[in-house]
Protein backbone atom coordinates (compact mmCIF):
# COMPACT_ATOMS: atom_id res chain seq x y z
CA UNK A 1 0.00 0.00 0.00
CA UNK A 2 2.81 2.38 0.89
CA UNK A 3 4.37 1.85 -2.55
CA UNK A 4 1.18 2.83 -4.38
CA UNK A 5 0.55 5.99 -2.36
CA UNK A 6 3.92 7.05 -0.91
CA UNK A 7 3.01 10.72 -0.49
CA UNK A 8 -0.12 10.11 1.55
CA UNK A 9 0.20 10.43 5.32
CA UNK A 10 -0.09 7.43 7.59
CA UNK A 11 -3.28 7.20 9.65
CA UNK A 12 -2.47 4.39 12.06
CA UNK A 13 -5.44 2.98 13.97
CA UNK A 14 -3.33 0.48 15.90
CA UNK A 15 0.14 1.67 16.86
CA UNK A 16 2.22 -0.29 19.32
CA UNK A 17 3.83 2.80 20.74
CA UNK A 18 3.85 4.40 24.15
CA UNK A 19 2.29 7.90 24.02
CA UNK A 20 4.88 9.04 26.55
CA UNK A 21 7.56 8.52 23.87
CA UNK A 22 6.06 11.46 21.94
CA UNK A 23 5.37 13.56 25.02
CA UNK A 24 8.94 13.29 26.30
CA UNK A 25 10.68 13.03 22.90
CA UNK A 26 13.67 11.50 24.70
CA UNK A 27 16.12 9.35 22.75
CA UNK A 28 15.44 5.63 22.85
CA UNK A 29 18.06 4.26 25.28
CA UNK A 30 19.19 1.30 23.18
CA UNK A 31 18.15 -1.36 20.69
CA UNK A 32 16.74 -3.65 23.38
CA UNK A 33 14.57 -0.87 24.83
CA UNK A 34 13.22 -0.16 21.35
CA UNK A 35 12.73 -3.63 19.88
CA UNK A 36 12.36 -6.08 22.78
CA UNK A 37 11.08 -4.81 26.13
CA UNK A 38 8.14 -2.74 24.81
CA UNK A 39 7.03 -5.27 22.17
CA UNK A 40 4.75 -7.96 23.56
CA UNK A 41 4.93 -9.93 20.30
CA UNK A 42 8.69 -10.22 20.70
CA UNK A 43 8.89 -10.96 24.39
CA UNK A 44 5.90 -13.33 24.37
CA UNK A 45 7.50 -15.41 21.61
CA UNK A 46 10.70 -15.67 23.61
CA UNK A 47 8.81 -16.39 26.82
CA UNK A 48 6.78 -19.12 25.08
CA UNK A 49 10.06 -20.84 24.29
CA UNK A 50 11.35 -20.78 27.85
CA UNK A 51 13.13 -17.44 28.10
CA UNK A 52 12.15 -15.86 31.44
CA UNK A 53 10.66 -12.41 31.09
CA UNK A 54 13.10 -11.13 33.70
CA UNK A 55 15.95 -12.21 31.40
CA UNK A 56 14.48 -9.84 28.80
CA UNK A 57 14.31 -6.89 31.19
CA UNK A 58 10.59 -7.34 31.90
CA UNK A 59 9.83 -7.08 35.64
CA UNK A 60 7.03 -9.14 37.19
CA UNK A 61 3.72 -7.31 37.10
CA UNK A 62 2.88 -5.63 40.36
CA UNK A 63 -0.72 -6.80 40.10
CA UNK A 64 0.14 -10.43 39.34
CA UNK A 65 -1.37 -12.94 41.73
CA UNK A 66 1.06 -14.05 44.41
CA UNK A 67 3.12 -16.95 43.16
CA UNK A 68 1.78 -16.79 39.61
CA UNK A 69 5.19 -15.93 38.25
CA UNK A 70 8.19 -16.42 40.45
CA UNK A 71 10.42 -13.58 39.42
CA UNK A 72 14.17 -13.76 39.39
CA UNK A 73 16.49 -10.81 39.11
CA UNK A 74 15.48 -8.53 36.24
CA UNK A 75 18.21 -8.18 33.63
CA UNK A 76 19.31 -4.58 33.19
CA UNK A 77 22.18 -5.12 30.74
CA UNK A 78 20.69 -4.19 27.37
CA UNK A 79 23.48 -5.95 25.48
CA UNK A 80 22.77 -9.24 27.28
CA UNK A 81 19.08 -8.87 26.46
CA UNK A 82 19.98 -8.26 22.81
CA UNK A 83 22.20 -11.36 22.77
CA UNK A 84 19.29 -13.49 24.04
CA UNK A 85 17.14 -12.04 21.29
CA UNK A 86 19.78 -12.82 18.65
CA UNK A 87 20.21 -16.37 19.94
CA UNK A 88 16.49 -16.96 19.45
CA UNK A 89 16.12 -15.07 16.16
CA UNK A 90 15.17 -18.24 14.18
CA UNK A 91 11.97 -18.50 16.26
CA UNK A 92 10.58 -15.51 14.38
CA UNK A 93 10.99 -17.11 10.93
CA UNK A 94 7.70 -16.96 9.01
CA UNK A 95 5.97 -14.65 11.49
CA UNK A 96 4.55 -11.16 10.98
CA UNK A 97 6.90 -10.01 13.74
CA UNK A 98 9.90 -11.14 11.68
CA UNK A 99 8.60 -9.27 8.63
CA UNK A 100 8.23 -6.12 10.71
CA UNK A 101 11.66 -6.50 12.35
CA UNK A 102 13.39 -7.15 9.02
CA UNK A 103 11.68 -4.08 7.56
CA UNK A 104 12.64 -1.92 10.55
CA UNK A 105 16.25 -3.11 10.45
CA UNK A 106 16.54 -2.64 6.65
CA UNK A 107 14.63 0.58 6.14
CA UNK A 108 15.30 2.28 9.45
CA UNK A 109 18.90 1.31 10.05
CA UNK A 110 20.26 0.02 6.73
CA UNK A 111 20.96 -3.41 8.23
CA UNK A 112 20.90 -6.11 5.57
CA UNK A 113 22.49 -9.05 7.38
CA UNK A 114 20.43 -11.54 9.38
CA UNK A 115 20.69 -11.12 13.14
CA UNK A 116 22.61 -13.95 14.79
CA UNK A 117 24.86 -14.32 17.83
CA UNK A 118 28.01 -13.72 15.77
CA UNK A 119 26.90 -10.25 14.62
CA UNK A 120 24.68 -9.29 17.57
CA UNK A 121 27.17 -6.78 18.99
CA UNK A 122 27.76 -5.07 15.64
CA UNK A 123 24.03 -4.70 14.95
CA UNK A 124 23.33 -3.57 18.53
CA UNK A 125 26.05 -0.91 18.25
CA UNK A 126 24.85 0.25 14.83
CA UNK A 127 21.28 0.69 16.04
CA UNK A 128 22.44 2.42 19.23
CA UNK A 129 24.59 4.86 17.24
CA UNK A 130 21.55 5.83 15.17
CA UNK A 131 19.32 6.12 18.24
CA UNK A 132 21.76 8.62 19.73
CA UNK A 133 21.09 11.08 16.89
CA UNK A 134 18.28 13.67 16.80
CA UNK A 135 16.90 12.03 13.64
CA UNK A 136 15.85 8.99 15.65
CA UNK A 137 13.96 10.74 18.43
CA UNK A 138 10.26 9.80 18.57
CA UNK A 139 8.88 13.02 17.11
CA UNK A 140 11.49 13.11 14.35
CA UNK A 141 10.52 9.56 13.36
CA UNK A 142 6.86 10.55 13.49
CA UNK A 143 7.59 13.33 11.00
CA UNK A 144 9.96 11.29 8.81
CA UNK A 145 7.39 8.53 8.38
CA UNK A 146 4.69 11.10 7.55
CA UNK A 147 2.40 9.95 10.34
CA UNK A 148 -0.64 12.17 10.65
CA UNK A 149 -2.44 10.16 13.34
CA UNK A 150 -1.43 7.25 15.52
CA UNK A 151 -3.72 5.64 18.04
CA UNK A 152 -1.83 3.64 20.58
CA UNK A 153 -2.57 0.30 22.13
CA UNK A 154 -1.93 1.72 25.57
CA UNK A 155 -4.04 0.53 28.47
CA UNK A 156 -7.60 1.86 28.28
CA UNK A 157 -7.26 3.07 31.87
CA UNK A 158 -4.03 5.00 31.21
CA UNK A 159 -4.60 8.57 32.39
CA UNK A 160 -2.21 10.00 29.76
CA UNK A 161 -1.10 12.52 32.39
CA UNK A 162 2.13 13.09 30.49
CA UNK A 163 0.11 14.69 27.65
CA UNK A 164 -1.92 17.15 29.75
CA UNK A 165 0.51 20.06 29.32
CA UNK A 166 0.72 19.61 25.57
CA UNK A 167 -3.04 19.38 25.18
CA UNK A 168 -3.56 22.53 27.28
CA UNK A 169 -0.94 24.40 25.23
CA UNK A 170 -2.70 23.45 21.99
CA UNK A 171 -6.04 24.60 23.36
CA UNK A 172 -4.56 27.99 24.31
CA UNK A 173 -3.47 28.30 20.76
Residue ranges and their predicted role:
Residues 1-9, 15-173:
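Metal-cofactor-binding active-site regions of metalloenzymes
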Amino acid sequence: MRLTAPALPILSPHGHTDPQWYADNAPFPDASALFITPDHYVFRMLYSQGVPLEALGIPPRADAAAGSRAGGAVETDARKIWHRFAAHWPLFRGTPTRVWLDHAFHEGFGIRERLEPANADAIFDRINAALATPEFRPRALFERFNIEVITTTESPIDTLEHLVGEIEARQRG
